């Protein structure tokens, strides 16, 4: 299979055709090899218009959803970004090509280690991974110019909102354990939060102290 052709087709038919306009983001998705972040047996499906299982009851998000959430962050290249839910590492790889520094938190050790290997393979040295409860964030590195959460939460965790810089944007799926709304939060100078509902979505649930408490 020619992955370069598959990746180009993915961007043209799934990303650009659905209204994603950020040129830097489009270039990043043309550049980052998504198949590196899935199991070898599923590499041929890596550029399909669907989420894929990556083990540990987790998934790699649909390419369009990765693009949409990233575009909502409005990255210019100078930002420090926090990602909650490293998963396969693909979203972190996209962020790493668009921002200055990426801090990503994954609670499942095998996924974090596998993601680290994939990111290292691509030479993405501006990504820092922490194995921890993502709903707590990464307080010692706060504040962040942008925060992206790749799992569905019952509400926006206060801990994450607190770690968002003034003028920063937080993108997160919010709802029940089966269906959510993609939400963008922008922090104002007075510390207040402006909330925008973007679109319906469906993510695995955000497990942790300030999310869904358990996997059950």
UniProtKB/Swiss-Prot annotation:
InterPro entries: PCMT, SAM-dependent_MTases_sf. It is found in: Cytoplasm. It comes from the Bacteria. The keyword Transferase applies. One of its GO terms (molecular function) is protein-L-isoaspartate (D-aspartate) O-methyltransferase activity. It catalyses: [protein]-L-isoaspartate + S-adenosyl-L-methionine = [protein]-L-isoaspartate alpha-methyl ester + S-adenosyl-L-homocysteine. Coiled coil: none annotated. GO terms for biological process: methylation; protein modification process; protein repair. The active site is at residue 61. The keyword rRNA processing does not apply. Its EC number is 2.1.1.77. Gene3D superfamilies: Vaccinia Virus protein VP39. CDD domains: AdoMet_MTases. Pfam families: PCMT (PF01135). Keywords: Cytoplasm, Methyltransferase, S-adenosyl-L-methionine, Transferase. GO terms for cellular component: cytoplasm. NCBIfam families: pimt, PRK00312.1. Catalyzes the methyl esterification of L-isoaspartyl residues in peptides and proteins that result from spontaneous decomposition of normal L-aspartyl and L-asparaginyl residues. It plays a role in the repair and/or degradation of damaged proteins. Belongs to the methyltransferase superfamily. L-isoaspartyl/D-aspartyl protein methyltransferase family. This is Protein-L-isoaspartate O-methyltransferase. It comes from Geobacter metallireducens (strain ATCC 53774 / DSM 7210 / GS-15). The gene is pcm.
């Amino acid at each position: 299979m020619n992955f370069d052709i598959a990746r180009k087709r993915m961007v043209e038919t799934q990303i650009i055709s659905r209204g994603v306009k950020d040129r830097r983001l489009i270039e990043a998705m043309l550049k980052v090899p998504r198949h590196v972040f899935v199991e070898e047996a599923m590499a041929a499906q890596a550029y399909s218009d669907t989420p894929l299982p990556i083990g540990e009851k987790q998934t790699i998000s649909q390419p369009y959803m990765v693009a949409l959430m990233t575009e909502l962050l409005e990255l210019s290249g100078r930002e420090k970004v926090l990602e909650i839910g490293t998963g396969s590492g693909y979203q972190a790889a996209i962020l790493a090509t668009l921002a200055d520094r990426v801090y990503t938190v994954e609670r499942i050790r095998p996924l974090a280690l596998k993601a680290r290997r994939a990111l290292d393979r691509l030479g993405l040295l501006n990504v820092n991974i922490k194995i921890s409860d993502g709903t707590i964030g990464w307080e010692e590195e706060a504040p962040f110019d942008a925060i992206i959460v790749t799992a569905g939460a019952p509400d926006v965790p206060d801990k994450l909102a607190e770690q968002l810089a003034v003028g920063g944007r937080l993108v997160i799926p919010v709802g029940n354990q089966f269906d959510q709304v993609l939400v963008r939060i922008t922090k104002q100078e007075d510390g207040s939060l402006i909330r925008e509902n973007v679109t319906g979505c469906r993510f695995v649930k955000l497990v942790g102290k300030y999310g869904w408490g358990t996997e059950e």
